[in-house]
């Protein structure tokens, strides 16, 4: 994708969907529009990237999107609603490099479903295609009376 300083090449990740590489304007209004409200930013990775999310997403009841996991694979938080993975420049957000875009597309590729069990939250990968119903191989039993 062609980049200039007025646009950012980022990953947009919506609940239940695969990440999409998109171009957005490099301004606050465009970031807010992309996540549906006030933005928050988190820097959970060692790479020069940030997650830009709706700061009020959980309070608004937006659907949980993806789990954030520590280095041991344990979930420590979940992002609600649409979020962006953006690059970091010296003082501001920047376009993702092709390598970072590929890395984080793979990390967040599989949509996740969240299931509350008591006071625990279970995170399950969503299948790419809905399961198809298998044809029945046996006919219903007939009863003689």
Question: How should these model regions be labeled?
Answer:
Residues 2-131:
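N-terminal nucleophile
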Residues 132-145:
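Non-Sec secretion/translocation targeting segments of pathogen effectors
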